[in-house]
Amino acid sequence: MTTPAPLTGLLPLNPEQLARLQAATTDLTPEQLAWVSGYFWGVLNPRSGAVAVTPVPERKMPGVTLISASQTGNARRVAEALRDDLLAANLNVTLVNAGDYKFKQIASEKLLVIVTSTQGEGEPPEEAVALHKFLFSKKAPKLENTAFAVFSLGDTSYEFFCQSGKDFDSKLAELGGERLLDRVDADVEYQAAASEWRARVVDVLKSRAPVAAPSQSVATGAVNDIHTSPYTKDAPLIATLSVNQKITGRNSEKDVRHIEIDLGDSGLRYQPGDALGVWYQNDPALVKELVELLWLKGDEPVTVDGKTLPLAEALEWHFELTVNTANIVENYATLTRSESLLPLVGDKAQLQHYAATTPIVDMVRFSPAQLDAEALIGLLRPLTPRLYSIASAQAEVESEVHVTVGVVRYDIEGRARAGGASSFLADRVEEEGEVRVFIEHNDNFRLPANPQTPVIMIGPGTGIAPFRAFMQQRAAEGAEGKNWLFFGNPHFTEDFLYQVEWQRYVKEGMLNRIDLAWSRDQKEKIYVQDKLREQGAELWRWINDGAHIYVCGDARRMAADVEKALLEVIAEFGAMDIEAADEFLSELRVERRYQRDVY
């Protein structure tokens, strides 16, 4: 599988050199990175008295514009791999993040390829929201001279599987674009589909665009300034869990943990706004229960990625057990001829509801059957890492990384169930135990470059995590810009996450304003969006003063409710209608003044 960084075995740098290089460049802007690149090229190719001249090709080569619209990094990895394939075929390619793409130039594109994921309820990734809105607006141009292809990544456990890719594909065709290839919709196990699609794209584009001389093949755009690290999703760092502290009260309905992980001397670097990827082990007790329900022993040999493993080991480390999907329910029903599940087959809504409310182990318990080991793993999806917003800044914690974990716990007919990664960190990794981690960089959730810029942070629940990192960074830098936090949770006494730290920031003058919404401390429920409306006039003043707005947390409900409140505030105090307010907020998004990290 292709990773965000080249395989270290193919690089002229060893892991330590790569780590030092990353540490030296982690805070540089794309423009600064480009300058450094040119500087080293000049060092390598000194020409006394020569003036650098950009060679002009004999004829302009048709270029391929490749747009990466990524939420968790997978779409970016596919786009980067396709970029490399196109360069190897000597084709001109411009790879760009959707958030950096000047979408009004889309009418001039001849060859356009989009690799996109989907988030929430079928919404485009955060970095692609502006492009999506533009294409679906009255301003979208005709695209009769544009040929396009779309690769869509999704997760069949969600109702609106690959909806963003479906949207882009249908809209580009509706605007007159020529579809080069049928859209591909890939589930979480996307690698094989992506590899096949990439090969087809290269073949098609080679027939559409003349092959350039190697010196003419170029790759430009923000995505090319990637973060290089010897540790990746497929080659994670084996780190140490040093602190596991419950930060909700004993009477809280929530179990939230502050987790600290020691990165040692790995040199692994991150920035506020990045996420920590965590590979986890399924609960051995859950594996034992599932195996016994199917009348298996756990020692049956199965093949995983070409290796033979005992079934129990394969289930613990290689397969998703805590998230059910409509496809799994349908396939299990068909395979076992279950009388209770077969009536659901063909009814998408019922399948989705059943999968969302019934874990895999309970599906088997309620509809027992006998399967052999290979049939069982054939039903399951591969284990994927969980991403957690980083709650620390290395300017303060150095070789540590902190995350805020809401532990998923619930009962199914009296049987305790838990989330895979959250219970792994909270219950099964002892302090000083090993955990495999990597950094998922998120350049679409960054503090302002100007330290004097005001910042508005909206993060209920565990959405508070990146704002702890933001404040640590701003404090370490002595940033003079004002800071305003909106936080909410059920109860003040039980659920005020990092309360002492926020109070200290207020006392020190670093946190200029804090508005708190406790939804269960009074008869009428109060949420952060209510506080936004309550502070509308002051909020509008901050926006007019150039403030950047950040939202982190639940994508399904909170993010939409917060955006609705922001639109109402902009409309009321900006003296405009909702449509104009929506345009205003879209402009803030394009200017990177409205950024969201929602999940």
Curated annotation (Swiss-Prot):
Domain FAD-binding FR-type: start-end pairs: 234-448
Record-listed FMN binding positions: 70-75, 117-120, 153-162
Database matches in InterPro entries: CysJ, CysJ-like_FAD-binding, CysJ_Proteobact, FAD-bd_FR_type, Flavdoxin-like, Flavodoxin/NO_synth, Flavoprot_Pyr_Nucl_cyt_Rdtase, Flavoprotein-like_sf
Gene Ontology molecular function terms on file: flavin adenine dinucleotide binding; FMN binding; sulfite reductase (NADPH) activity
UniProt keyword Amino-acid biosynthesis, yes or no: yes
Details of cofactor binding: Binds 1 FAD per subunit. Binds 1 FMN per subunit.
Pfam families attached to this UniProt entry: FAD_binding_1, Flavodoxin_1, NAD_binding_1
TM segment ranges: none
Keywords of the record: Amino-acid biosynthesis, Cysteine biosynthesis, Electron transport, FAD, Flavoprotein, FMN, NADP, Oxidoreductase, Transport
Entry binding sites for NADP(+): 519-520, 525-529, 561
Binding site for FAD: 322, 356, 386-389, 404-406, 410, 419-422, 599
Domain Flavodoxin-like: 64-202
Pathway: Sulfur metabolism; hydrogen sulfide biosynthesis; hydrogen sulfide from sulfite (NADPH route): step 1/1
Function (record text): Component of the sulfite reductase complex that catalyzes the 6-electron reduction of sulfite to sulfide. This is one of several activities required for the biosynthesis of L-cysteine from sulfate. The flavoprotein component catalyzes the electron flow from NADPH -> FAD -> FMN to the hemoprotein component.
Subunit structure: Alpha(8)-beta(8). The alpha component is a flavoprotein, the beta component is a hemoprotein.
Family named by the database record: Belongs to the NADPH-dependent sulphite reductase flavoprotein subunit CysJ family.
Protein name, UniProt field: Sulfite reductase [NADPH] flavoprotein alpha-component
Species annotation: Salmonella choleraesuis (strain SC-B67)
Lineage: Bacteria, Pseudomonadati, Pseudomonadota, Gammaproteobacteria, Enterobacterales
Gene: cysJ
